[in-house]
Amino acid sequence: MQPRYAIAALLIATLSITGCTTNTETQTSTTQATDQPVAAAQAPEAIAAAEPVINGFQPLPADKALTKIAFGSCLHQSRLQTIWDAVLAADPDLFIFAGDNVYADTEDMAVMRGVYSELAAKPGFSKLKATTPILATWDDHDYGVNDGGKDFPQKAKSQKAFLDFWGVPTDSSRRDREGIYHAVIVGPEGQRTQIILLDTRYHRDDLERIPQDQRTGGPYAEKDDPSVTMLGDRQWAWLAEELKKPADLRLIVSSIQVVANEHGWERWAALPWERDKLFQTIEDARAEGVIFLSGDRHHGEVSVCGGTGPYMSVDVTSSGLNQARGRTITEENHHRAGEAVGDNHFGLLTIDWTPEYPTVHIQLIDEQQRAQFDDTLDTKKLTFTYGEGDHHGRHSQSVANPE
């Protein structure tokens, strides 16, 4: 079987990209452009990476450049987990769990802990845990309730169960905050990867449901209300500060999709004012090199758009470690690069730090170790000077036609 390549050289070439704008108005940043990446101008002598971990998890070294980052989502603890052979064969420096890492859906924390114990007993997961550093965020099913938000009554207890399972020390400051959001910066100057793991559950307001007889896809409309929140005030303030820290590549892990907006299921576009705020926060911080990683959808795809921010937005969705739909995906997504992946798979980012701007080889790899998506991103396209030039980084009209 040949890999399902994205549109020929779609990401490595100069792109023409459909915009990500919604029906809200976003204020333009007054920050002036510079010719140099913000990271180079603000670099401190050293930045600590992840805190220590416990319970047999592997620490993430602070000073080692990351060259292979694997990630995935939607892993049912009671089903076969044959994907781990392919993950371990890829030998990643880090694995990121992007949510729905177990399916608990419960307010009973004894049940929640039992579900985590079932995952811990899986041989493939045990091998990963013993050999590979792991970072994780949650989505609704490991949060505790399908499509849940801020009103879940057991969210504080669920947070404790999450942090306990994923090896976060009992004296960590992460146990004092409301929500599991977290960030690390790894690697030496010039090869620094920032990984920001958002919590899209703990503070999220209710979504707006579409009446059953009016649905053409998922159940959620765009809620045109600037007062609602996805992240909550404290997490927003934290994110703004994190994005000001110097880094050469930034991965923002969101359990739900950031770019795709047509399907009607949970997505950032369901709260369009918050989605615009996300792009604006990146722009205000002058944060270059952002790639979104997402899950939730039970299929894989890469979505690309011009966005309301200063350069194109790339969202790599890997969803279905063992919960993929197992069929051809016909769902419309006019931001999609290439084809969607309906088989169980994981995402793999391979970073080449040799060029002035690193390149990121993006693959979605199935259980047979076949790359069903395979393309390379030149991160120069994720810079302010590129986005503000004549490269269609901001106001393009077509996703299908690279220049």
Predicted regions located by residue number:
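Bacterial N-terminal signal peptides that target proteins for export
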Residues: 1-7
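Hydrophobic helical h-region of N-terminal Sec-dependent signal peptides
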Residues: 8-12
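C-terminal motif of bacterial Sec signal peptides marking the signal peptidase cleavage site
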Residues: 16-19
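Bacterial signal peptide processing site
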Residues: 21-23
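Extracellular mucin-like PTS domains
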Residues: 27-31
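Metal-dependent phosphoester/phosphodiester hydrolase catalytic core
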Residues: 38, 42-403
